[in-house]
Amino acid sequence: MGLLWYLMSLSFYGILQSHASERCDDWGLDTMRQIQVFEDEPARIKCPLFEHFLKYNYSTAHSSGLTLIWYWTRQDRDLEEPINFRLPENRISKEKDVLWFRPTLLNDTGNYTCMLRNTTYCSKVAFPLEVVQKDSCFNSAMRFPVHKMYIEHGIHKITCPNVDGYFPSSVKPSVTWYKGCTEIVDFHNVLPEGMNLSFFIPLVSNNGNYTCVVTYPENGRLFHLTRTVTVKVVGSPKDALPPQIYSPNDRVVYEKEPGEELVIPCKVYFSFIMDSHNEVWWTIDGKKPDDVTVDITINESVSYSSTEDETRTQILSIKKVTPEDLRRNYVCHARNTKGEAEQAAKVKQKVIPPRYTVELACGFGATVFLVVVLIVVYHVYWLEMVLFYRAHFGTDETILDGKEYDIYVSYARNVEEEEFVLLTLRGVLENEFGYKLCIFDRDSLPGGIVTDETLSFIQKSRRLLVVLSPNYVLQGTQALLELKAGLENMASRGNINVILVQYKAVKDMKVKELKRAKTVLTVIKWKGEKSKYPQGRFWKQLQVAMPVKKSPRWSSNDKQGLSYSSLKNV
């Protein structure tokens, strides 16, 4: 056997050498016809000469005295070798113009050449064969054919491809279909039907790789053919539209100064149309970019939706734009089989504002900022500002008004409120601020009529200071008499103002006079330790409500009242 193969090889090389000097039509390596097959599966390959390069078929050529010769070049080799047709079990054989592998092996990968010749004529072509190793899930480097079907558009079928000629029509092979790694059994809208796979109303979820495994017997052996088809669900024809230009549009103006970079995107949406050639291009003043003297760069990008609707973007850019460039007409064009569309970009030169406008804007901005600052300052320090104005520019209310007291203090007669009035309020208002207080229990004479003396004291006072607490609202108390008298005096004569100081919160407001007073008068809240500091907010609010006095009744040397440190101990 070895001697016979050696003699055949010598004969083959002799034939090649004898025709090396003869003219032979060499069609080269037909890379468009690269054949991929799985390892350990049969393969049948027809000589491409009779399919693409010659006008006659094998029978005509054979009857004319032409001989078909096969040889190959191993992968990563340059030496042409004859094909060994004497392998065990006829693993490689030739039948007319077909080369058979039953089955293929990985080392069968290489370039195969079929040559048709006689003594006066020679023609040959080569094609690559790649044997691919199969994994457990049909994934490999093999390129799969793509079958497109319209979304929600009737019933579609795919057929197991490239199985014709492997077995006679009398043989009924078994066929198993898979999606990815999963055998197709009881799928929602996919039904295997032998060599066919039917899709009922295709959906995007049907996208994927579908594999058919065909098993057939031959000469006592079982062979398997594995074929994979990529299914892609695409947009329906009823949704097909002419191009839709998203950008440029009438809402966007590209305003640039000379020397700046001008960038204009032309963004176009194409609905899916089978075999449609989608185009996008720019014109500048009616000319293509290559026909104008402007230094223009155009970059294109394409993206696809799940149903292969296409968004194509062409970005036109000019690095340093000139005034002349800003006067040009830039138009985006688009076309598909449904029609054409175009949209001009709005480009203009930016107007630089005059200098005085900038200065005016800056001045206005500064004014607004100053006003805002003043409003904030007033909001934070309004009490201090009012007290400052009263101290320096206010009119003294105590001159010739016939009043004896600055403040009449009304409060509930119990230990806690009395301590707050006699120690805290009196200590600060009289000793620190110089006001004269009228406190009934301190200033009334023994034996007098309470009602008459109360009304008399209130009429002699400029302010009625009401210390609110839960005990204050009890019916029948002297405190309520003082409140009613003060409110009536304020309403009828207007010669006394009422000041409400909330010493403790009053939840149930049953006294209608007090309820009405709280709705129209400001309530100054005592907050315990936080309010004891004489320069704090509580005392400033109280001072604002007090009568304006130009100078205290006592000099600072006569003040022997409470200091802040003494208030802390109250």
UniProtKB/Swiss-Prot annotation:
Region (Disordered) residue spans: 550-570
EC class of the enzyme, as a word: hydrolase
BP terms from Gene Ontology: cytokine-mediated signaling pathway; inflammatory response; innate immune response; interleukin-1-mediated signaling pathway; interleukin-33-mediated signaling pathway; positive regulation of interleukin-13 production; positive regulation of interleukin-4 production; positive regulation of interleukin-5 production
Extracellular topological domain residue ranges: 21-367
Signal peptide: 1-20
Biased composition (Polar residues): 553-570
Sites carrying sugar chains: N57, N107, N111, N118, N196, N209, N299
Classification via Pfam families: Ig_2 (PF13895), Ig_3 (PF13927), Ig_6 (PF18452), TIR (PF01582)
Catalytic reaction(s) noted: NAD(+) + H2O = ADP-D-ribose + nicotinamide + H(+)
Residues covered by the Ig-like C2-type domain: 21-128, 139-230, 243-348
Gene3D superfamilies per UniProt: Immunoglobulins, Toll/interleukin-1 receptor homology (TIR) domain
Disulfide bond entries: C24-C122, C47-C114, C137-C181, C160-C212, C266-C332
Keywords tagged on the record: Cell membrane, Disulfide bond, Glycoprotein, Hydrolase, Immunity, Immunoglobulin domain, Inflammatory response, Innate immunity, Membrane, NAD, Receptor, Repeat, Secreted, Signal, Transmembrane, Transmembrane helix
Segments crossing the lipid bilayer: 368-388
Domain TIR intervals: 403-546
Entries under PROSITE patterns matching the protein: IG_LIKE (PS50835), TIR (PS50104)
Free-text note regarding domains: The TIR domain mediates NAD(+) hydrolase (NADase) activity. Self-association of TIR domains is required for NADase activity.
EC number(s) stated in the UniProt entry for this protein: 3.2.2.6
Subunit relationships: The interleukin-36 receptor complex is a heterodimer of IL1RL2 and IL1RAP; the association is inhibited by IL36RN. The interleukin-1 receptor complex is a heterodimer of IL1R1 and IL1RAP. Associates with IL1R2 to form a non-signaling interleukin-1 receptor complex. Interacts with IL-33-bound IL1RL1 to form the minimal interleukin-33 signaling complex with a 1:1:1 stoichiometry. Interacts with KIT (independently of stimulation with KITLG/SCF). A mast cell-specific KITLG/SCF-induced interleukin-33 signaling complex contains IL1RL1, IL1RAP, KIT and MYD88.
Name this polypeptide is given: Interleukin-1 receptor accessory protein
Ranges facing Cytoplasmic side: 389-570
Keyword Protein biosynthesis belongs to the record: no
Family classification: Belongs to the interleukin-1 receptor family.
